């Protein structure tokens, strides 16, 4: 039986707006009683509005003996509930029992805030799919089950005679050119990956679905079985466009055992916050369970198996341009630093609590080992601090000393049998002298490949702007965006475009000035290579904002969920027809932009690009000074003066 999402009850937009900050007790009938907690501190981020993580929900039923909760009159923060049977207390903000302390966590329902302002409370059914055909653990031998860490979220799992890999990002960048591998993978990674029996890929982000890695894999073994979840946004939605040949992709329903052999099976489960794209996996070998929650914010709606043999999850944070790439208003360096510090600490404690709830034999923090290594992203690297895996493991050990923890190094191997029986040597580190951290990334190869898009002929016709934004399909939203193309360091670039798009109507319009009506305004300065690659290939906008490839300001300072959600996962699944566009332009005899490619720039035209619509002199493309060309004649003059002075001195002696 596959897992399905079922709406338990709904609140209308009016009922949702009437929810108070803190605890709300809702009774639909004697048997239908619920708790909804509304977090007044929830904030918008660049990836999601506050409403997506503002609410928590559960049945109004104590986990101890089924009593009903009432508000605790001693609680001044409006988050503590007291059971009428035995006085147990639940903190609705964390969904953990605080009396008795360290006892249980409450099983949660999944709140989903809708576009019309209504709120659905959803339950995954069956809520605990791993209970279906449950198996008792069988004895293991040393060496029978081994987990080898490679990089980021990529591990090799030996399950008897079977080899399974997860999320292979082992070469090249992710999110265009924004993320680079922190760790150097084992030297034989490609041989081992190509010989694997199966691969699980959790979702479509390029630090998990990495086409540079998969391209090399496909040349060795295009028929390797690859398993993905049946998400509404398909993991391999851009496979054909990528040119990578993979012939054995399996799309699987959620919460259903996938039988590999008599000893090995696994299931894919959805995320409660991002069910349209994020998944996690539960692996069962002879009744021993390995839980890989990857990037899921609320894996399986918060209901996870207890007492698994091993758990792996993300931990680091920093997987977004917010707030480092934002400017204006409150976004001072001090505000950013405080925000990052606060959010990383919250994430650290959230992950600690999640691990304690699952109570695995051993826990491994992973899926956070990336670095903003390119020199042009030095600012991001210095400000986008991330959690330390050792700090998380120390926190877990402080409150749950029985949980073993592992901060992995590439090539290190965990033996599950040794971990279960309590051996201290359950980890085998790679040989001394093995390189752990990468110190070379082949920047030029990958950045040049991206920047080839700058020279695509479509950008010689300004009409590409109208063609592309009509293709996106986003409309009927009172938002004006300004898109400005910049160089790698976000300085003006000759031939770059600078334009506005207004989405208020059935079709976008393209004003040269901001409209007089009241409207939301979003301004983005984008690296020209990444911007043009995104446009030409019809890619999701993740490369721009998760990859730190733009700089953003907005008026008012509001997160526009509908816009970002559309550009992130709702773009058309067919590419823009650029061949047809070029054919039409040439048939119509459309004029080309005077300068549309920085390589065309000459001193004569560099002072002004009349094809660009100017908004202000500080940001107008094509109006900046080229200091190298200005200083070249000056250098000649200085040299001539120097020669003259030398001659004068020699003659005066």
Curated annotation (Swiss-Prot):
Key words, A-Z: 2Fe-2S, Electron transport, Iron, Iron-sulfur, Membrane, Metal-binding, Oxidoreductase, Transmembrane, Transmembrane helix, Transport
Binding site residues for [2Fe-2S] cluster: 62, 64, 83, 86
Basic and acidic residues compositional bias, start-end: 606-618
EC code: 1.14.18.2
Pathways involved: Amino-sugar metabolism; N-acetylneuraminate metabolism
Topology of this chain in the membrane: Single-pass membrane protein
GO biological-process terms attached to the record: CMP-N-acetylneuraminate metabolic process; N-acetylneuraminate metabolic process
Function statement: Sialic acids are components of carbohydrate chains of glycoconjugates and are involved in cell-cell recognition and cell-pathogen interactions. Catalyzes the conversion of CMP-N-acetylneuraminic acid (CMP-Neu5Ac) into its hydroxylated derivative CMP-N-glycolylneuraminic acid (CMP-Neu5Gc), a sialic acid abundantly expressed at the surface of many cells.
Family, as annotated: Belongs to the CMP-Neu5Ac hydroxylase family.
Name of the featured protein: Cytidine monophosphate-N-acetylneuraminic acid hydroxylase
Gene: cnh
